[in-house]
Amino acid sequence: MLPIVELFQNRKLTIYLPEGYYESEERYAVVYVQDDGDLIDPKDSDVLQKIRELTAANQLPGLLFVGIESFDRNDEYTPFISPNIFEPESGKQFGGNASVYADFLANELKPYIDSKYRTLPTREHTGIMGFSFGGLISVYSGLRYPDVFGRVGSFSGSFWFPGIVDWIEQLSIHDTGQRLYMNLGHAEGFGRTNGQQWMVPNSKRVYQYLLQNGFHEDSIRQVIYESNFHSFDLGVQYVPEALQWLFNEE
């Protein structure tokens, strides 16, 4: 089934409907995917096909995916204004507009999707996920709107970003029933001299804090795989099993 491409507030959306959507009246859980849906884009990997196979085998519920175009990920996916470490001599900054973008996701995009498609709108049926900065903004949005996004996936999330750990550690987190999946390579950022050197230690710190404050062992999972690189190709391989853990009730 080909994806549906449409515009919402001048932003491209790529909608991947579950198989059999038009042949039934069933309602489906929704997963909002950053970076134009790169984690499930058939051009980038075979992840979507694996998801379809798991669903056909009754190992994963049918899911509706919404790939969301970013106008500028360095602005929309970053929680705070900070020097752009990728262009240190340019004077450019990360825009720090994550709060505006998260509000758009929760209060504008989600109601639109729920009104147009047959969705299960409750938080336990609403997921959000992304890679790198996309993982960062997914966790940020999930923690900012726990009553909206009940299933959160971060693949090599950029927790090296200045201020994000402090922001998370000042939150008053309660047992919201959320599930949070995080993964990263065991040596991502090692040898770097910029802020990315904090990728692994900050990710572990976030996991431990959340585990001790509001989440339980059965509601948060961190997977650390063998890799020295910040690799999309490696991180994306874990998407099917992450979705199984996030959406299959144990």
Describe each model-derived feature in a short phrase.
Residues 1-250:
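Non-catalytic cap/lid and distal C-terminal segments of serine-dependent acyl enzymes
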